[in-house]
Amino acid sequence: MKHIKLSGRERAVLRYIDWATGTNGDELLDCTKIEPEDLVDVLNGLMEVGYVEMMPYAEHTDLDTFREKTFEVNPSYALELRAAMQRL
């Protein structure tokens, strides 16, 4: 099992992503209260390592498009991410 370390902002974003159906960027912005630029950076970082996927699929997102996209947890990492979220 891969040992995953998450920052506080990554935890906040993952906490609000619906692990079954995904969550759109606008909802994440409202729930996390993170500035849009920072939220885009966190989402791009999570997508870069493969923990989060974006629908429709793309390698990264930007300020202009992230609000309409849906973000979901990559099922391949779901168990490891749940364990990482429980650790402090």
Language-model-derived ranges and their functions:
Residues 5-6, 34, 73:
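Alpha-helical hairpin
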Residues 66-88:
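Short, amphipathic alpha-helical interaction segments positioned at domain boundaries
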